A protein has these predicted regions:
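Acidic-enriched and Gly/Ser
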Residues: 3-30, 36-39, 45-161, 497
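Conserved catalytic/coupling modules of large nucleotide/cofactor-utilizing molecular machines
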Residues: 4-9, 13, 96, 263, ...
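P-loop NTPase nucleotide-binding/switch module
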Residues: 101-103, 110, 114-117, 130-179, ...
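Phosphate-binding/switch loop-helix module in NTP-utilizing enzymes
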Residues: 171, 248-285
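Walker A/P-loop NTP-binding active-site region of P-loop NTPases
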Residues: 176-226, 277
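Nucleotide-state-sensitive switch-loop elements of NTP-binding domains
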Residues: 203-206, 217-263, 290-302, 322
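Loop/turn-to-beta-strand initiation segments
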Residues: 205-208, 234-237, 268-272, 325-330
Length: 548
């Protein structure tokens, strides 16, 4: 059917034909590929906002840790799921968020990028780059919070993770998959111990994560510079939430680092994670919980603050061989006040971990660094995480030093001591000097074994305390140049070499060292150092003379 419309040109009108069939076919053609779709969204509204917290109504199907989107694109994290509303923390700028605004449920659980693309980078708890080197390149993401490996999925900790610190590797050894707490007052060297442990993993096939929680920005920059200088950033990722960050970021930072570490563990690799420090995470969680109006408990912490740390630290494990045999080792840090390890958060974390390294303020101030207090420090894994060589030389070292500390405290009262006690004190001072170590200078396991063998077998007994560090330095130089085969044997086998060879080498060096020390003293016009027996003989007539 065709309709024709006509008009005169003079009147400005025109003729055209309308073909209904053509119009229908064109419309059909355009509608053929059309599929109706509905964009369905869950939308709620803000009923209260302030202090980084938003209370939202109208999102009944929201999950815990689900991401919410505010107007303007700012993200929030659902933490409280109440009957009538949701308590969410705002992950970003709050200036434009107001009551009455719409909030959209994204359906996504908070995740972070993982994988080797993170190595050498400094990121925030959401995995966003902070180092100005462009976006993080990662093809995989992982949820911040996942279930820790079960009992069947684990195997006992039996493989050593060398920290490079003599006093730790000898007396409180750390194994792959272990959780070893580093605890002490502020300014006692906790961060230095952990950074040294990271530096010592170079060439060991261990990837590292350093999580800085509530630290000063300058402190984090210093740690990153130290790691770069030592070439450790090649296998390390730094996750930082500085003191200037809002509380939600400090709360999330450790879980973000754990997710990155678990990725490597699940792929059969080995990882080491440092949480520096969990005291500040607990304080941030307390702040969030009080703002979310959760009931406060002891010291105003919420009732689940133990679970806050236990679910984090339980994610560190040594997986069974059927799952690839990967491991995630944790070094959590806790700051104490006035040395009080019996406070709430310290006792919580001590009960969760597999031992603790306690750094004492008095030792630190007296020049014993690292300031490890052997009396209270312990590794619940113990000798299982040591090589046979280290176990052989460090067998009684911890007991000897603990007894020395007690005897030293007793001697400070000015009591008369017998010859055995004096000898024990003298050896204790020399062993303490031997265990001192410079900042950021971790020592290979084979060199530690040689050094400790010399100390525990009495080779230091005839030296002055002031000569011990020089003796150790020159002894190790001698072994590197003349006895590298012995060092290589210790490194490859993990066992002590032929004791006669080792003892003969140390004995020969000790004699040369004593001769050179005496010659130097004679040339300087000083009396040569006497051994203990000669000194005791000289003391006796002097005492008789003074009595007369």
């Amino acid at each position: 059917m065709t309709d024709t419309v006509s008009s005169s040109p003079l009147s400005g009108s025109f003729d055209f034909d309308l073909d209904a069939d053509d119009i229908t076919s064109v419309l059909r053609k355009h509608l053929e590929g059309y599929a109706p779709s509905l964009d369905r969204q869950q939308v709620g509204h803000i009923i209260e906002v302030g202090d980084g917290i938003a209370r939202i109504s109208g999102l009944p199907n929201t999950s815990v840790n689900e991401l919410l989107e505010f107007e303007g694109g700012t993200l929030g994290l659902a933490l409280n799921l109440d009957e009538e509303s949701i308590g969410a923390v705002v992950l970003g700028e709050m200036g434009h968020i107001e009551e009455g605004q719409a909030v959209t449920a994204t359906g996504r659980i908070l995740s972070v990028p993982v994988g080797d693309g993170l190595l050498g980078r400094v990121v925030n708890p959401l995995g966003q780059a902070l180092d100005g080197k462009g976006d993080v390149t990662s093809s995989e993401t992982r949820r911040l919070e996942v279930q820790a490996p079960g009992v069947v999925d684990r195997q006992p900790v039996k493989e050593p993770l060398q920290t490079g610190i003599k006093s730790i590797d000898a007396m409180t050894p750390v194994g792959r998959g272990q959780r070893e707490l580093v605890i002490g007052d502020r300014k006692t060297g906790k961060t230095a111990v952990c950074v040294d442990a990271i530096i010592n993993q170079k060439g060991q096939g261990v990837k590292c994560i350093y999580v800085a929680i509530g630290q000063k920005g300058s402190t984090v920059a210093e740690v990153v510079a130290t790691l770069e200088e030592a070439g450790a950033m090649e296998y390390t990722v730094v996750v930082t939430s500085p003191a200037s960050d809002p509380a939600p970021f400090k709360y999330l930072a450790p879980y973000s680092g754990a997710a990155m570490g678990q990725h490597w563990m699940d792929n059969g690799e080995h990882a080491l994670i440092v949480y520096d420090d969990l005291s500040k995470q607990a304080e941030a969680y307390r702040q969030l919980s009080l703002l979310l109006r959760r009931p406060p408990g002891r010291e105003a912490y919420p009732g689940d603050v133990f679970y806050l740390h236990s679910r984090l630290l339980e994610r560190s494990a040594k997986l069974g061989d059927h799952l690839g045999g990967g491991s995630l080792t944790a070094l959590p840090v806790i700051e104490t006040k006035e040395g009080d390890v019996s406070a709430y958060i310290p006792t919580n974390v001590i009960s969760i971990t597999d031992g603790q390294i306690y750094l004492q303020t008095d030792l630190f101030r007296s020049g014993v660094r690292p300031a490890v207090d052997v009396g209270i420090s312990v590794s619940r894994v113990g000798g299982s995480a040591q090589t046979k060589a280290m176990k052989a030389v460090a067998g009684t070292l911890k007991l000897d030093l603990a007894q020395f500390r007690e005897l030293e405290a007793f001697a400070s009262f000015g009591s008369e001591l017998d010859a055995v006690s004096k000898a024990q004190l003298d050896r204790g001072y020399k062993l303490t000097e031997l265990l001192k170590q410079g900042l950021h200078s971790p020592m290979p396991m084979e060199e530690q074994v040689v050094s400790l063998y010399a100390g525990t077998k009495g080779f230091l007994d005839d030296l002055e305390v002031s000569d011990v560090r020089r003796f150790e330095q020159e002894l190790l130089e001698e072994f590197r140049s003349r006895y590298s085969d012995l060092l290589g044997e210790i490194k490859s086998s993990g066992k002590l070499p032929d004791k006669d060879k080792l003892e003969e080498a140390i004995k020969a060096f000790t004699k040369r060292f004593q001769d050179s020390t005496k010659a130097k003293a004679a040339s300087d016009g000083k009396p040569a150092a006497k051994d203990d027996k000669a000194a005791a003989k000289d003391e006796k007539p002097a005492a008789e003379k003074s009595a007369g």
